[in-house]
Design a protein with these regions (language model features):
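ABC-family P-loop ATPase nucleotide-binding domains
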Residues: 92-148
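A short, flexible loop at the N-terminus of ABC-type nucleotide-binding domains that lies
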Residues: 2-31, 38, 81
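ABC transporter nucleotide-binding domain
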Residues: 176-267
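Helix-to-loop junction immediately C-terminal to a conserved catalytic motif
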Residues: 60
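The feature captures the beta-strand-to-loop junction immediately N-terminal to the Walker
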Residues: 45-47
Length: 294
C-alpha cells in the first residue's frame, strides 16, 4: 500500500498517546501510538512481559487506559455498539470457553450474537479439526480447546481478528492448517488481523507487516519483505560506520558498542534504495530483528 493510501485510508483501529498501568505498578503502555488499516495482517512481536496482551486488551476496549484514546471502527473502543462488536473476532491467550458446555452448545450460544455467522464454515472446521460436538469442553484436550476458540473467532467473518498466541498448544501440522485457514480468510474478506506469537516461523508465513514492541511502545512497524531488503548489520569503527550511514542516508535502528572503538549497528535504508555491493553489510533474519528491536 503506497504512502498516500496509508495517509488517507480510514483506520480499522487507532491508538493515540495510550498509557496504561496496573494499580501501583510501572506503566505497561507508555504513550503508545498505533494504527491498523483495513486488510493489514500485523504480527505483534515482543519479549515476555513487554505488554502485548495488555495492548491487545486495550485495543479491544477490555482495558481502559489512564491516558490516550483507542478507537475501533471510528468509535471509542470501550463503548462500542453491538454492530461494531459483531465485526470483531478474538482469541485470548487464556481460554475463556464455557467448560461446562459442549462445543455444540457453545457455538449455538455465540451464533446468536453474530449476524454473519457461517454455519457451513463452522461445520467444515469442526470436522476438519476433529472436534467432538457433544463432549464437554472441560474434557477436550488443550489443543482441541484452542481449535474451538479459533473456530469461534473465525465463524462470523470478522472485519478485525485479534489473535493472542492462537497456536501455542497446536502441533506443527495443526499450526500450519490454522494458518492456511487464516490466510484464506484474509484473502477472501480483507480482514484486518493482529497476530501475537512467539513462533517466528508462523509469522513469516502469514504476517505481511511486523510491529515490534519495546518499552511500552511500538518501536517499529513495517512490511516484512521491506525489512528483509532494507535492514542490514554493519560492523566497524564508529567513524567508518557513521560515514557509510551518511553516504547511504540510512537510519540506525540499534547501536551496540564493541571493544577497540568499534560498534555494531543495525541500520535501515530509505525505501526504494539498495545496499551497494561494496558495503560490508550482513543480511538479517526475523530472529535477528526480534532480538535487536524488542
Amino acid at each position: 500500500m503506497n504512502q498516500h493510501l496509508l495517509a488517507t485510508t480510514t483506520p480499522t483501529a487507532e491508538l493515540a498517546g495510550v498509557s496504561l498501568a496496573y494499580t501501583l505498578g510501572e506503566p505497561v503502555l507508555r504513550g503508545l501510538d498505533w494504527r491498523l488499516l483495513p486488510g493489514q495482517v500485523v504480527g505483534l512481536l515482543g519479549r515476555n512481559g513487554a505488554g502485548k496482551t495488555t495492548l491487545l486488551e486495550a485495543l479491544l476496549g477490555l482495558r481502559e487506559p489512564q491516558t490516550g484514546t483507542v478507537r475501533l471502527f471510528q468509535q471509542p473502543a470501550h463503548r462500542l455498539d453491538d454492530a461494531a462488536r459483531s465485526r470483531i473476532g478474538y482469541v485470548p491467550q487464556q481460554s475463556d470457553l464455557f467448560e461446562a458446555f459442549t462445543p455444540a452448545q457453545l457455538l449455538a450460544y455465540f451464533k446468536s450474537f453474530y449476524p454473519r455467522w457461517n454455519e457451513a464454515k463452522v461445520n467444515g472446521l469442526m470436522s476438519r479439526w476433529d472436534i467432538a460436538r457433544d463432549k464437554r469442553i472441560s474434557k477436550l484436550s488443550v489443543g482441541q480447546q484452542q481449535r474451538l476458540s479459533n473456530i469461534r473467532a473465525l465463524a462470523h467473518h470478522p472485519d478485525l481478528l485479534v489473535l493472542d498466541e492462537p497456536v501455542s498448544s497446536l502441533d506443527p501440522a495443526g499450526r500450519r492448517d490454522f494458518l492456511a485457514e487464516l490466510v484464506e480468510q484474509v484473502l477472501e474478506r480483507g480482514t484486518t488481523v493482529v497476530f501475537s506469537t512467539h513462533i517466528l516461523s508462523d509469522l513469516e508465513r502469514v504476517a505481511f507487516n511486523l510491529a515490534f514492541m519495546s518499552g511500552g511502545r511500538i518501536a517499529l512497524q513495517a512490511p516484512l519483505d521491506e525489512l528483509m531488503d532494507e535492514v542490514r548489520v554493519l560492523t566497524g569503527t564508529t567513524a567508518e560506520v557513521q560515514a557509510l550511514l551518511q553516504r547511504l542516508g540510512a537510519g540506525s535502528l540499534k547501536r551496540t558498542p564493541l571493544a577497540g572503538g568499534r560498534e555494531r549497528v543495525m541500520a535501515r535504508l530509505p525505501a526504494g534504495t539498495q545496499w551497494p555491493a561494496d558495503a560490508d553489510a550482513q543480511a538479517v533474519s526475523l530472529e535477528d530483528l526480534f532480538m535487536e528491536l524488542t
